[in-house]
A protein has these predicted regions:
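N-terminal carbohydrate-binding accessory modules
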Residues: 35-101
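Aromatic-lined substrate-binding rim segments of carbohydrate-active enzymes
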Residues: 88-98, 104-153
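Non-catalytic C-terminal accessory domains or segments of carbohydrate-active enzymes
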Residues: 392-941, 948, 954-988
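Substrate-binding cleft/loops of secretory-pathway carbohydrate-active enzymes
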Residues: 223, 246-287, 364-367
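Active-site neighborhood of glycoside hydrolase catalytic domains
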Residues: 179-248
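Catalytic-core region of carbohydrate-active enzymes that cleave or remodel glycosidic bonds
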Residues: 277-367
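N-terminal export signals
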Residues: 7-28
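Aromatic- and acidic-residue-enriched segments that line the glycan-binding/catalytic groove
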Residues: 117-123, 149-170, 260, 371-373
Length: 988
C-alpha cells in the first residue's frame, strides 16, 4: 500500500483507486509494498513540512514511509486540555526530546461548536496552529476527530446542542449524519493543509469514530462507518485511516465494511488498559491468534495499538486510587509497569504504539465527563503541570532505540529460550541476524538467571515486576555487540565516531561483549568501568549510576572508526539527547531538556532547560569548537572522547517567590431565589415532548435544560403558582452527572439541598444519576397568594455515549415537581448560561448570576464588596463570590508552573469554581475530593504581571462553609522554557 495525495485525488471508491492501491483490504491480502522485500535500514528522517510529497505504506511488520521502516512511538496529548497555545510547543518539545516521534490528538466537537452551524478554530481552539507546531517540532500527528471521541469529556465530545436533536447518534440516521458531515468538513478543511503525503505537514494517520462496538454486525453500523470513510476521503484526506477497537474484538478490520473500490487505505487498531496487577498480555506474535487475539485479527497490517494505558482516570471521591489521586496512579503504573507492558507489546509486534496519556492536562470549565474531576493528570509521564516525571525513562530509552537502531522495526519470532524465573520472548531480525530478548519478571522478588544467547549464556538480573530488553549480534556500526546484560538505548554517529548507549537500573553491573577480531585500543575514560580483552572479544563491566555517565572509547584495530560506549543508569540516560541537524547528529548530555540544536559553522547552538546545577557535554560533527546554550557562549574544553565539555557548571534555577493571597472581597448572590425577582426575560418551560432518552413524566412539562438551549454549568428554575395552602411537601425529581446537586427556596426561604452520592466501585462509571429531593414546607410558608419555588441545579455535565444508545441525551436539570397536600398549577421559567464567551468558549460558564454579571472577569468593579479574611466559616445556602488580585514577578528566563491549593476541614460541604482572569479552571468539592491543587496554566496566568482570582463558592447549608486555606503552590521550575504568549482574557 502506498498512499499519496494524487492517489486519493478522485472521490473515494473509483475504479482507479482500487488499481492504484492494490488489494490489502481483506484478510490475507497483501499491500503493494509486500510484492518486494523491504530490507532493514535507517528510519526516515524526522518529519517536517518540507514541501516534498511522501508515500505512506505498510506491511505486516511496520509502516513504510518513503519505503523506509517506521516504528511509531506516540503519546496522547489533548490540546483542548491545555488552554494556552504557547504551552503546546513546550510539551511537544519535551515529547520529541524524550524519544517520541508522534503525537496523537483527539479533536473534540463540543470544544469548537457552540451551536449548529457555528465553529471556532481560533485562540485556544486553533487546530491549525497545533498542527503547525507539531510539524515544526518534528513529530508525526495521529489525528482523531471522531465525531465521537469518548475521552472522558462532556458528552464524549458531542456538542451540547446535539442532545436536543432528533437523529440517533453514532448511526446512519440521516439527521445525525448531516451534523457529522458539517463537523468533519470543518476539521478536514484544516487537516488537509497538514498532510504528510503532501509535504505540507506531518499528519500521518487519521481515525474515524472511536471504540464503536455497538451493533457491529448490523447493516446500519456498516453503512455508518462507510459513510465516514467516504466523507473523509472526499474531503481530500489521503493518509491511512483506522478505527480504535475497544479491546480485542476484531471489529472493523480491513474488508469489514464497504470502502468502495478502494483497498489498502485502512488499518486495524485496538486499545488496552491492563491493570498493574495483571500479567502483561500477548496481543500479537506470541498470542493465541484469531479475530480476538489483537494484532492477529488483521495479519496483513502491522500491529497497531492506538491507545495503551499510560495511567488511568480518577473519579470524584477518588475511589480508583483510595483517595490519593493521580500520584497513586503514577505510583502503581510506574516506569517498571511501562517496561513490563510496553516491552511485551513490542515483542508482540505492536510497532504502532500510542500511550494514552503522555500528557493529560486539565478538564477545565465544564469540559469533564461525569466520571472525572477537573484534573486529567492521568498519572502520565508528563504531569498536569508539564513536569517530566520518573515515568519518562522507559519512554526515552525505548523511543530513541526504536528510531536509532533499525533492527527493531522488523522482527520475527525465534526459537524459544528459557531463563529460570523469567518469561522470555526471543525474536530475530531476518535481514541483520540481530537477536532481541525481552525478559519479564512477574514475581515479587528480583530474579537473576542465565539467558541463553547466540554468543553464550548471559547472566541478567530483572527486578521484581519489571522487564528488560537485551540484544545480541547487534550492529554498533563496523563493530558488533555480541551481547549486553543491559538495554541498548541508542546508536548514533557523531563526526567520525559511532556512539552506542546502554542503560539499566541504578546499581546494576553492566556487562557488554563486543566483537573485536583485531586487538583495539581501549581507553577507560571514567574510573568506574573495567575491561578485558580475550578470545571472545572485548568485555566491558561497569556499575551503573556510580558517578553519572560512564565512557569507554574503543578505537583502532581492524575498524578505523572509533566506537564510544556510554553506560548510564535511568536517571542519567534521560539527560542524553540526540538531535539530527543538516550538518549531522548532535548528542548532548547534561541538561534537563534539549529543545533544539543547530550547527553554524564551528558553533553548535543549543536551547533547552536546566533544572539544577549541571555541566554539559556535546558530541557533534567534525570541526565544532564552540558551544552556545540559550544564546550564551560557554567556555569548553575538548575531551578524549571527542566531545566539547563545559569547564564549569551551569547555574541552577533562580528562586521563585510566590505571594500570599490576601485582600479578598466577597458578595453573596442568588437574587433568583427572591419572590420579587424579575424573570420575565426567562424561557417558559412549556414543551410537551423531547428528544431526550429520559421520559417526560406524565402531567409534567419538559423541564430538561438542554431542550431550552442551556447545556453547561448551573441552571435556574422559577416555578410560579397561586395559593400554597395545604402544601406539606415538594418533591423535585432531577437528573445530573456525578456529584450533581439541587437546592431549593420557596419565596426566598431555603428549603434545603440535595446532592447525588459519591460514587463507589460499583457506580464509578455511572454517567447519569437520578433522584428525588423531598423538602417539607414549613407552616408559615403555606399561605394564599402568589408564590415562587426557585431551584438551582448543578448539572455536572452530560454522560458519554459509549454504548451508542444516545446516553448523552439523558436529561439534565429538573425532571418533575410533585406537591403533597395540594396540587397547584405551576408555570415554570428556566435560565442557564448566557451567550458563549467569544474568547473562552461555550464550556467556560454556566448560569450563575455572578457569571452573567461578570463577577469572574478581570476589571470588574468590586470596590463596594465586603472585605474578608480567609479562612471563612459561614453557613449559607447558595453562592458566595470571593475576589482578589495578585502580582507575580517570575524571572523572564524561568519557566515556573504554579497551582492554586485549597484546603479545609473535609466535613464542610461546599464546592468552589475557580476563575483565573475570567477562565474557569476547575471545580473543587471540599467534602468529596480528592483534588486540592489546580494547575494555573502560564499564558492564562500572567507570570510577570497582575492576575484576578475569583472563587464562586456554592454552600450546601448542611454544614459550615469555607473557603479555608487558599494559597499559590510552586509545582515546578526550570531555567529555559519556551516563549509564552498571553492568552487573551477580556474583562469588564
Amino acid at each position: 500500500m502506498a498512499l499519496s495525495r494524487r492517489t486519493f485525488s478522485a472521490l473515494a471508491g473509483s475504479a482507479a483507486l482500487g488499481l492504484a492501491l492494490g488489494g490489502s483490504g481483506g484478510p490475507g491480502a497483501s499491500s503493494a509494498f509486500a510484492a518486494r522485500t523491504v530490507p532493514t535500514g535507517p528510519a526516515p528522517a524526522p518529519p517536517s513540512a518540507d514541501g516534498e510529497p511522501h508515500t505512506i505504506g505498510y506491511d505486516r511488520y511496520s509502516l513504510l514511509v518513503d519505503g523506509k521502516r517506521l516504528v511509531v512511538w506516540s503519546g496522547e496529548l489533548p490540546p483542548f486540555r491545555l488552554p494556552s497555545p504557547s504551552l503546546w510547543r513546550d510539551v511537544l518539545q519535551k515529547m520529541r526530546a524524550h524519544g517520541y516521534n508522534a503525537v496523537s490528538i483527539y479533536v473534540a466537537w463540543n470544544y469548537h461548536s457552540p451551536a449548529p452551524g457555528r465553529y471556532d478554530f481560533t485562540g485556544v481552539r486553533d487546530l491549525d496552529l497545533f498542527l503547525r507546531t507539531a510539524a515544526e517540532t518534528g513529530l508525526y500527528v495521529i489525528l482523531r476527530p471522531g465525531p465521537y471521541i469518548n475521552a472522558e469529556v462532556d458528552g464524549g465530545g458531542f456538542p451540547g446542542w446535539l442532545t436536543a436533536t432528533r437523529g440517533r447518534a453514532r448511526s446512519d440516521d440521516p439527521e445525525y449524519l448531516a451534523h457529522v458531515d458539517e463537523w468533519l468538513t470543518q476539521v478536514n478543511r484544516i487537516a488537509r493543509k497538514h498532510l504528510f503525503t503532501q509535504g505540507t505537514g506531518t499528519v500521518l494517520l487519521y481515525q474515524i469514530e472511536n471504540e464503536y462496538d455497538a451493533r457491529v454486525g448490523s447493516a446500519g453500523s456498516r453503512a455508518y462507518m462507510s459513510h465516514l470513510y467516504r466523507k473523509v476521503r472526499a474531503d481530500g484526506i489521503d493518509v491511512p485511516l483506522f478505527h480504535n477497537d475497544k479491546g480485542r474484538n476484531g471489529y472493523w478490520t480491513p474488508g469489514s465494511f464497504d470502502t468502495g473500490s478502494e483497498r489498502g487505505g485502512w488499518l486495524y487498531g485496538f486499545d488496552g488498559y491492563p491493570s498493574p496487577e495483571s500479567t502483561p498480555p500477548d496481543w500479537g506474535t506470541f498470542g493465541p491468534g484469531g479475530a480476538k487475539g489483537g494484532a492477529s485479527a488483521s495479519p496483513s497490517t502491522p500491529g497497531f495499538v492506538p491507545e495503551f494505558g499510560g495511567g488511568w482516570f480518577d473519579p470524584w471521591g477518588g475511589v480508583f486510587f483510595d483517595g490519593l489521586g493521580y500520584a497513586e496512579s503514577r505510583r502503581t503504573r510506574d516506569a517498571a509497569y511501562e517496561r513490563r507492558f510496553y516491552l511485551t507489546n513490542l515483542a508482540n509486534g505492536l510497532t504502532l504504539h500510542n500511550v494514552y496519556m503522555t500528557f493529560g492536562g486539565t478538564s477545565w470549565g465544564w469540559l469533564p465527563a461525569p466520571v472525572v474531576y477537573t484534573s486529567y493528570d492521568y498519572g502520565a509521564a508528563i504531569d498536569e503541570a508539564r513536569q517530566v516525571t520518573d515515568k519518562i525513562a522507559p519512554m526515552h530509552q525505548l523511543g530513541h532505540l526504536l528510531q536509532r537502531v533499525p533492527d527493531f522495526a522488523k522482527l520475527d519470532r525465534a526459537a524459544d529460550v528459557r531463563a529460570t524465573g523469567l518469561k522470555v520472548y526471543h525474536l530475530t531480525n531476518p535481514d541483520t541476524g540481530a537477536h532481541v530478548y525481552v525478559a519479564r519478571n512477574d514475581g515479587d522478588d528480583t530474579v537473576t538467571a542465565d539467558l541463553p544467547t547466540a554468543a553464550g549464556d548471559l547472566r541478567i538480573s530483572v527486578p521484581a515486576r519489571d522487564a528488560k530488553l537485551v540484544a545480541a549480534d547487534l550492529s554498533l556500526g563496523p563493530r558488533k555487540l555480541k551481547y549486553a546484560s543491559v538495554q541498548p538505548s541508542m546508536r548514533v554517529t557523531a563526526g567520525r565516531q559511532d556512539i552506542a548507549v546502554f542503560t539499566g537500573p541504578k546499581g546494576e553491573m553492566a556487562e557488554l561483549l563486543v566483537d573485536c577480531p583485531d586487538e583495539p585500543d581501549v581507553l577507560r575514560l571514567d574510573p568506574e568501568a573495567a575491561w578485558v580483552l580475550d578470545d571472545t572479544g572485548l568485555h566491558v563491566n561497569a556499575p551503573l549510576g556510580q558517578g553519572g555517565l560512564i565512557r569507554v572509547l574503543v578505537e583502532k584495530g581492524e575498524r578505523d572508526r572509533p566506537l564510544l560506549l556510554l553506560l548510564a543508569d535511568d536517571a542519567t540516560a534521560v539527560r542524553l539527547f540526540p538531535y539530527d541537524t543538516p550538518s549531522g547528529t548532535v548528542l548532548v548530555y547534561g541538561p534537563a531538556l534539549l529543545r533544539h540544536a543547530e550547527v553554524r559553522g564551528s558553533e553548535v547552538h543549543l536551547s533547552g532547560d536546566i533544572a539544577e546545577t549541571t555541566s554539559m557535554e556535546v558530541w557533534g560533527p567534525r570541526g565544532i569548537d564552540t558551544l552556545v546554550w540559550n544564546g550564551r557562549r560557554l567556555p569548553v574544553r575538548v575531551t578524549l572522547s571527542g566531545s566539547l565539555m563545559t569547564t564549569g557548571p551551569l547555574p541552577g534555577v533562580p528562586e521563585v517567590r510566590l505571594p500570599r493571597l490576601g485582600g479578598w472581597r466577597m458578595r453573596r448572590e442568588n437574587p433568583e431565589a427572591g419572590p420579587g425577582y424579575d424573570d420575565s426575560g426567562w424561557r417558559t418551560a412549556d414543551r410537551k415532548t423531547s428528544f431526550s432518552t429520559t421520559a417526560v413524566p406524565e402531567g409534567q412539562p419538559v423541564l430538561f435544560a438542554d431542550d431550552y438551549g442551556f447545556h453547561y454549568g448551573d441552571v435556574w428554575y422559577r416555578g410560579t403558582f397561586d395559593d400554597a395552602r395545604g402544601i406539606e411537601e415538594v418533591a423535585l425529581g432531577y437528573s445530573t452527572g456525578t456529584q450533581g446537586l439541587l437546592m431549593a427556596w420557596l419565596d426566598g426561604e431555603p428549603l434545603g439541598t440535595h446532592r447525588m452520592p459519591v460514587p463507589d466501585r460499583d457506580t464509578v462509571r455511572k454517567g447519569t444519576w437520578t433522584d428525588t429531593a423531598a423538602f417539607p414546607v414549613r407552616e408559615e410558608l403555606r399561605s394564599p397568594g402568589r408564590h415562587v419555588l426557585s431551584v438551582l441545579v448543578r448539572r455536572m455535565q452530560h454522560d458519554q455515549d459509549g454504548k451508542a444508545d444516545d446516553g448523552h441525551k439523558a436529561a439534565r436539570g429538573l425532571t418533575a415537581a410533585v406537591f403533597t397536600g395540594a396540587s397547584p398549577k405551576v408555570v415554570w421559567r428556566i435560565r442557564g448560561e448566557g451567550p458563549p464567551d467569544p474568547v473562552r468558549g461555550p464550556l467556560n460558564n454556566g448560569g450563575l448570576h455572578g457569571e452573567r454579571e461578570g463577577w469572574h472577569l478581570p476589571g470588574f468593579a468590586d470596590r463596594d464588596w465586603e472585605p474578608v479574611d480567609f479562612p471563612v466559616s459561614a453557613r449559607y445556602q447558595g453562592v458566595t463570590w470571593y475576589r482578589t488580585t495578585f502580582r507575580l514577578a517570575v524571572p523572564g528566563d524561568v519557566d515556573a508552573s504554579v497551582g492554586l491549593t485549597l484546603e479545609d476541614d473535609p466535613y464542610r460541604a461546599y464546592r468552589a469554581q475557580i476563575f483565573l482572569n475570567g477562565w474557569n479552571l476547575g471545580q473543587y468539592i471540599n467534602n468529596v475530593g480528592p483534588q486540592h491543587t489546580f494547575v494555573l496554566p502560564n499564558g492564562i496566568l500572567r507570570t510577570r504581571g497582575e492576575n484576578t482570582l475569583a472563587l464562586a463558592v456554592l454552600s450546601e447549608f448542611t454544614t459550615l462553609s469555607g473557603p479555608g486555606t487558599v494559597r499559590l503552590s510552586l509545582l515546578g521550575r526550570a531555567l529555559g522554557g519556551t516563549e509564552v504568549s498571553v492568552v487573551p482574557s477580556p474583562g469588564r
